[in-house]
Amino acid sequence: MSLLVVAPEWLTSAAAELQSIESALSAANAAAAVPTTGLAAAAADEVSTAVATLFAGFGQEYQAISTQLSAFQQQFALTLNSSAGSYSAAEAQSVSILDTLGQDVFGAINAPTEALLGRPLIGNGANGTATSPNGGAGGLLFGNGGIGYSQTGAGIVGGAGGSAGLIGNGGAGGTGGAGATGGAGGNGGWLFGSGGIGGTGGANALGTGGTGGLGGSAGLFGGGGNGGAGGLGISGDLGTGGAGGTGGFLLGDYGVSGAGGDGRTVPLEVVNVTEPVVNVNVNGGHSTPVLIDTGSAGLVMQVKDVGGPLGLLRMGLPSGISMSAYSGGLTYLFATYPTTVDFGNGIVTSTTGVDVVLFSIPTSPYALTTWLNALWSNPLTTPFDAYFQSAGVDGVLGVGPNAVGPGPSIPTQALGGGLGQGLLIDMKGGELVFGPNPLTPEFSISGAPIATLWVSVNGGAPVAVPSIIDSGGVMGTIPSSVIGGSTLPANTNITVYTDNTMTTEVYHYSTNDYQPTVISSGLMNTGFLPFWNQPVYIDYSPAGTGTTVFDMP
């Protein structure tokens, strides 16, 4: 049995072209009729008359044949048009039959799971509506989640995207109503599929825009959904961007945060008055609090904060293994992995090195005692955990361009769009701002964090002291040679200047209120105090040295 494939639209087009050809031929025949059927004799003799009569007869025969061909051509064109209509009708009937058959078949397949679980076995979930804003779940076996409903009422959270079953993608979250949070993206399939993107936060002409919805997470294989963008607020800034979803347990990239704020600022929390802390997402592990430390260079985190052992596998082979230490008495072994760092609000680095702690050991009485005490409450506590427990962080983000380590890179310098040229630490304002300095400088010091400062004790002559301007140094240190003894004297005023002219003060304190640790040798450490007094901008220029800029309070 032979099969003929017909495209009705082609038949209709061919018929139209035939009609166009017929019109052209008719016009040509009409133009040729008089010259070819009414030939005049060249002369009055019998031969000329016979020749003219002969050729005129040929013209008349041609016109008769042309008339017959024109009628045939018109009939053929009508037949083509009729055939196209017949095939279109047959095709529409076939589609209708197949649709009905498909609905019947899938209806029979999905009926048991619809009755028991309220979702199909195969098929996409229904999109959200005003009365039921959350997208429906996709088929248990195969199908995408439905799209969440975008709200029109003020303050109403956008509908969540539906989750997939075994295979399929999560549905996108819906946009929030005015000032409200966008809906969360649905999760991807348990086996394979990507998470849905979070819904956009609701715009708000009277206040702050809504927060973007969370991106959906993947199952075993698939990418996490990106977080939704924050809604536009009255100030022109966006609301906070939603966090991205986690990538596949075995394979898949994580979703990045949605655009938010002004595109260069993230919240900064001050813990215990002394610790500037922000949250980062590395390799899709989870949001992790890290200390902003101008006294070091490089991001140091633990295995649990980069997705665990499987997270290490997803990052591939390390680019290096090394050891480093913190001055308070903690030594650690780490491996450097290439990955990205997400600061939130869509601020994400290009691939950069992140140091993952593999093993740590306390090397001071303080660090050892802290660890042993922590073991009583949690036997799985690592020395690294215990060392930074009081700071409320799980890692350290070193941002100092001329700090000694651990390196090998500073993630904030891997930000694009000009955001990698520096950062502002505003502890009292509660902000970490990337890119050019947004405030007015008061004075600057060459070097970040290592620089030479001048120290005066009780108004005496200043002494040049090599120092670390260290946001993570808590109370800091002071060399015994500066104060003339191994013990910090009471009722003593310490003033730190930019140079020996004593015209520009960096900071000052009374030893009754601020008590740095006395050291026998090494660099003086400012501790957190200068950063608490006023905003400080770390400029990565000149390369390898940097500049510490103190902005107007």
Swiss-Prot record:
It is found in: Secreted; Cell surface. One of its GO terms (cellular component) is extracellular region. One of its GO terms (biological process) is proteolysis. Changing D293G: Loss of activity. Keywords: Aspartyl protease, Hydrolase, Protease, Secreted, Virulence. The active site is at D293. Disruption phenotype: Disruption of the gene does not affect LipY surface localization. Mutant shows moderate attenuation in the zebrafish larva infection model. GO terms for molecular function: aspartic-type endopeptidase activity. Residues 1-92 form the PE domain. Undergoes auto-proteolytic processing. Signal peptide: none annotated. The keyword Cell cycle does not apply. Belongs to the mycobacterial PE family. PGRS subfamily. Aspartic protease that processes the lipase LipY and other PE_PGRS proteins. Can also cleave itself. Cleaves LipY both inside the PE domain, before amino acid 98, and after amino acids 136 and 149. Involved in virulence. This is PE cleavage protein A.
